[in-house]
């Protein structure tokens, strides 16, 4: 098995009308928990790491873990650079073998965002690495970045069309009302805006901030063209809550093999649920077909 580009996964998803789940990883246990479910449900998967994750565990170690698990689980997978902001950082990681990167210039004005994304696309495409970018800006907290509601804004369909044409990006993360983190009230998803974007943009669309979004909303976004669904916060909360509960019930416990497995099992339930919502179960193709 090998680390593959997300473009092969997303092309299949777009053709068949499902979405590939992208789960954020943090250590060996989170990688293993996710892949155990993907093997069980025969689902394609994208393992996403933010810059903070690569500070916690070195790139070479994460890459080696993903490669080893891909082989032992017999699952081709994509290791994705999530919310990276530096061309130099992406260049280093792509040269080390990563084949999927998100360059996040959403905090820049349109023209500056285009310039940054185009520079990343030019480099990455020469190395069979797919590129995701974001237009519009989600609120909430992601890694060390925090965007308040006043600075969040939705994606304009005509700007999205122009953005894709100018950059040559492979997939586009759109802002349609979701936010990073958990919601204090039911999110208002602009499905009409998503439909209008889909009419003028033919590349795979990406839904960020899918944690805590009602399942029926996520399914509707997939019907309207979303091919990649990002999940992070719900995974962490499930893992942490289960471990906390275990220590309350076992105050003298100290064996990571027990409490980490409890956390992993809780995370697996979230993974299983998201794969079902994305309708990606049974969609895994043999490696040679990617």
UniProtKB/Swiss-Prot annotation:
Catalysis: reaction(s): D-tagatofuranose 1,6-bisphosphate = D-glyceraldehyde 3-phosphate + dihydroxyacetone phosphate
Residues involved in dihydroxyacetone phosphate binding: 181, 209-211, 230-233
Binding site for Zn(2+): 83, 180, 208
Pathway: Carbohydrate metabolism; D-tagatose 6-phosphate degradation; D-glyceraldehyde 3-phosphate and glycerone phosphate from D-tagatose 6-phosphate: step 2/2
GO biological process, one term: D-tagatose 6-phosphate catabolic process
Keywords noted in UniProt: Lyase, Metal-binding, Zinc
EC number: 4.1.2.40
Enzyme class: lyase
The protein's required cofactors: Zn(2+)
Active site positions: 82 (proton donor)
Presence of keyword Aminoacyl-tRNA synthetase: no
Cofactor annotation remark: Binds 1 zinc ion per subunit.
Free-text function comment from the UniProt entry: Catalytic subunit of the tagatose-1,6-bisphosphate aldolase KbaYZ, which catalyzes the reversible aldol condensation of dihydroxyacetone phosphate (DHAP or glycerone-phosphate) with glyceraldehyde 3-phosphate (G3P) to produce tagatose 1,6-bisphosphate (TBP). Requires KbaZ subunit for full activity and stability.
Protein family membership: Belongs to the class II fructose-bisphosphate aldolase family. TagBP aldolase KbaY subfamily.
Subunit structure: Homotetramer. Forms a complex with KbaZ.
Protein name, UniProt field: D-tagatose-1,6-bisphosphate aldolase subunit KbaY
Organism: Salmonella arizonae (strain ATCC BAA-731 / CDC346-86 / RSK2980)
């Amino acid at each position: 098995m090998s680390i593959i580009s997300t473009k092969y996964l997303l092309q299949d998803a777009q053709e068949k009308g499902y979405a590939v789940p992208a789960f954020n990883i943090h250590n060996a246990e989170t990688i293993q928990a996710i892949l155990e479910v993907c093997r069980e449900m025969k689902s394609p998967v994208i393992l996403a790491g933010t810059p903070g994750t690569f500070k916690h565990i070195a790139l070479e170690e994460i890459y080696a873990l993903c490669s080893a698990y891909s082989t032992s689980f017999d699952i081709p997978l994509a290791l994705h650079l999530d919310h990276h902001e530096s061309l130099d950082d992406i260049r280093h990681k792509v040269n080390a073998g990563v084949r999927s990167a998100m360059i996040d210039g959403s905090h820049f004005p349109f023209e500056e965002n285009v310039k940054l994304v185009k520079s990343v696309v030019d480099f990455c495409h020469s190395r069979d690495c797919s590129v995701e970018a974001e237009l519009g800006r989600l609120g909430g907290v992601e890694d060390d970045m925090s965007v308040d509601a006043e600075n969040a804004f939705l994606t304009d369909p005509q700007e999205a069309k122009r953005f894709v044409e100018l950059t040559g990006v492979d997939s586009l993360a759109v802002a349609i009302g979701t936010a990073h983190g958990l919601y204090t009230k039911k999110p208002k998803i602009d499905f009409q805006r998503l439909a209008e974007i889909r009419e003028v943009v033919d590349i795979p669309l990406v839904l960020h901030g899918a944690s805590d979004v009602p399942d029926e909303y996520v399914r509707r976004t997939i019907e309207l063209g979303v091919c990649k669904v990002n999940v992070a916060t719900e995974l962490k909360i499930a893992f942490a809550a289960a471990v906390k509960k275990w220590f309350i019930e076992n105050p003298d416990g100290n064996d990571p093999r027990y409490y980490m497995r409890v956390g992993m099992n809780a995370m697996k339930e979230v993974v299983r649920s998201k794969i079902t919502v994305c309708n990606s179960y049974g969609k895994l193709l043999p490696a040679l077909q990617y």
